[in-house]
UniProtKB/Swiss-Prot annotation:
Component of the tRNA-splicing ligase complex required to facilitate the enzymatic turnover of catalytic subunit RtcB (F16A11.2). This is Protein archease-like. Pfam families: Archease. Keywords: Calcium, Metal-binding, tRNA processing. Ca(2+) binds at D26, D154, I155. It comes from Caenorhabditis elegans. GO terms for biological process: tRNA splicing, via endonucleolytic cleavage and ligation.
C-alpha cells in the first residue's frame, strides 16, 4: 500500500497535491489546492492512486460523472463514491487526471470528468481496495489562499 513514508521527496507530494496519512483501521486521504475545486480534484486522484499505481495508467478515454449532496461534506462523499462505483463496476475505470466542470456550492452539485482507462490486471497492480469513503472525521478547511480536505476511506 502506498504511504507517505515511501516518498522521500516532499516536493513530489506538493506537486501532486495529496498524501496518505496513517489511520488505525483505514487510510486518510489528505488533499489540497489553491481552491476547493483543486482540492476536490486532488482528493479523487489520490483515491485512485491509493488503489493502483497511476504512473501505469494511460489517458485512453474520458469518463463523466455528476453528484449531489445535502451539504459540502455530503457532496464530497457522493463525488468520491460516484467515481469509486465506476471502478467497482464495468468499465472498472481508473482516473489519472480529474477536472471539475461545474461546482455549485449553494446547491451542492458537481459535474466532473476524468481521464484514464479501464483497470486491467495484466497491466495494473492492485495496491489496496477502497470500499467506500466515510464521513468519519471528514474535513473541508477552506481559507482564502488554500483549501485542505481530509477523508478517511474504508479499505
Amino acid at each position: 500500500m502506498p504511504s507517505t513514508s515511501m516518498i522521500e521527496d516532499r516536493s513530489e507530494i506538493e506537486r501532486r497535491r495529496f498524501e496518505y496519512l496513517d489511520h488505525p483501521a483505514d487510510i486518510q486521504l489528505h488533499s489540497w489546492g489553491s481552491t476547493m475545486e483543486e482540492a476536490f480534484e486532488a482528493c479523487l486522484v489520490s483515491m485512485f492512486g491509493y488503489m493502483t499505481d497511476l504512473a501505469k495508467v494511460d489517458e485512453m478515454y474520458e469518463f463523466y460523472w455528476k453528484a449531489s449532496g445535502d451539504s459540502l461534506d455530503g457532496l464530497l462523499f457522493q463525488f468520491l463514491d460516484e467515481a469509486l462505483n465506476s471502478f467497482h463496476a464495468e468499465p472498472c475505470f481508473v482516473a489519472k487526471r480529474v477536472e471539475i466542470l461545474r461546482f455549485d456550492k449553494k446547491k451542492f452539485e458537481i459535474e466532473f470528468r476524468g481521464w484514464g482507462e479501464s483497470f486491467d490486471t495484466s497491466k495494473h497492480e492492485t495496491e489496496a481496495d477502497i470500499k467506500s469513503p466515510t464521513y468519519s472525521n471528514m474535513q473541508i478547511n477552506e481559507k482564502p489562499e488554500r483549501c485542505d480536505i481530509y477523508v478517511i476511506v474504508d479499505i
